[in-house]
């Protein structure tokens, strides 16, 4: 699972979940991508589950890029504990996916395989997504 090596502070405030994504809105590495259309927290377990679903369908062909990283901790207090007595323990790590953000990219497979692999991955995620190509979004081209 993905989590940061070290953090400056163990516990943080909850991140904002309003507005559109400021960066990471273009397909830069691969040919096809999975773009978020709604806002939600995505946990490191959900990211890993989506990655496994994609790579199993592609039979380890092609290449997958994970374009989000869960660098924000979320905390939770134990069950049946009274209010107060400080913030709870870190329960896991989340990434905030806002509309427009590219979550995964794929290259090295044809469009039908990429579309189905990203569809399987989208079922593991709590956000609504859409399939995008590099040409549609105007990403960089690697022509030399």
From Swiss-Prot:
CDD domains listed in its UniProt record: Ribosomal_L16_L10e
Transmembrane domains' residue ranges: none
Biased composition (Basic residues): 1-19
One Pfam family hit: Ribosomal_L16
Region (Disordered): 1-23
One GO location term (cellular component): cytosolic large ribosomal subunit
Record note on quaternary structure: Part of the 50S ribosomal subunit.
Free-text function comment from the UniProt entry: Binds 23S rRNA and is also seen to make contacts with the A and possibly P site tRNAs.
Name this protein carries in UniProt: Large ribosomal subunit protein uL16
Organism of origin: Staphylococcus saprophyticus subsp. saprophyticus (strain ATCC 15305 / DSM 20229 / NCIMB 8711 / NCTC 7292 / S-41)
């Amino acid at each position: 699972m993905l989590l940061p090596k070290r953090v400056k502070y163990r516990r943080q405030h909850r991140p904002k979940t309003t507005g559109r994504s400021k960066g990471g809105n273009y397909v830069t590495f691969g040919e096809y991508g999975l773009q978020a259309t709604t806002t939600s927290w995505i946990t490191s377990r959900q990211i890993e589950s989506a990655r496994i679903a994609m790579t199993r369908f592609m039979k380890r062909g092609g290449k997958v890029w994970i374009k989000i990283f869960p660098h924000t901790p979320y905390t939770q207090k134990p069950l049946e504990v009274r209010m107060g007595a400080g913030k709870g323990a870190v329960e896991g790590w989340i990434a905030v996916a806002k509309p427009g953000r590219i979550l995964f990219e794929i290259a090295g497979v044809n469009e039908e395989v990429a579309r189905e692999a990203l569809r399987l991955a989208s079922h593991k995620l709590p956000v609504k997504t859409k399939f995008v190509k590099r040409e549609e979004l105007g990403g960089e081209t690697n022509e030399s």
